[in-house]
Amino acid sequence: MNDPRIIVALDFPDQCTALNFAAGLDSTLCRVKVGKELFTLAGPQLVEKLMKLGFDVFLDLKFHDIPNTVAAACSAASSLGVWMVNVHALGGSKMLLAARQALDGKRTRLIAVTLLTSLNQNDLSELGIADTPETMVQRLALLAQRCGLDGVVCSALEAVSLREVTGEDFCLVTPGIRSFGDGNDDQARIATPAMAIRSGASYLVIGRPITRSPDPLGALRRFNDEVASVL
């Protein structure tokens, strides 16, 4: 079974641009991620069109609400046929359990967001959280695992410790992936593909290094080659 490790973030301002870009990729080499901006603009029909192009879709809407609302949202996402959907672990165990129950018996994978990769120690302090990012991520990841979720989003820098405490079957989805020489953009905890895979990441979310490349398919192939070199 083909299991591409790279998830390309389709962070585009409109459906036409996103679909034209996706059509130039190879669905055997990647999955695609649709986030809040694009989904709000284009809606479920965009997901359906991407699936018709052969892509598995990660619907990155980070649900965070009362348990019943999140459960209904997860069920609706699954009815679209998406491969993966996410929720905020900070929603707590009742919300996480409701989301898990809503997807029981369905193919859609459910993961939790621990801490956004843009947050550093100073940001946590401003929120009244004394823990380090690493400690907070581990606590939230273990909560998600206890609630039966398939995995979490985490930076590559936290993946080593998370892999140790969650085991081999827990899915670690890692954003903030760059090649050496790329800018950090707005993500504080970044890594190269090889670093992330060696750290224990299951899937890598890559956006601008592919979407802003003059040769997106070539960039995707290079990232895949780097992943393959350490598997």
From Swiss-Prot:
What lineage does UniProt assign to this protein's organism?
Answer: Bacteria, Pseudomonadati, Pseudomonadota, Betaproteobacteria, Nitrosomonadales
Cite the entry's keywords alphabetically.
Decarboxylase, Lyase, Pyrimidine biosynthesis
What organism does the record attribute this protein to? Nitrosomonas europaea (strain ATCC 19718 / CIP 103999 / KCTC 2705 / NBRC 14298)
What is this protein's name? Answer: Orotidine 5'-phosphate decarboxylase
Q: Which HAMAP family match?
A: OMPdecase_type1_B
- What domain of life? Bacteria
Q: What one GO molecular function would you report for this record?
A: orotidine-5'-phosphate decarboxylase activity
Keyword Repressor in the entry? The reply is no
Check the record and name the PROSITE patterns matching this protein: OMPDECASE (PS00156)
Q: What does this protein do?
A: Catalyzes the decarboxylation of orotidine 5'-monophosphate (OMP) to uridine 5'-monophosphate (UMP).
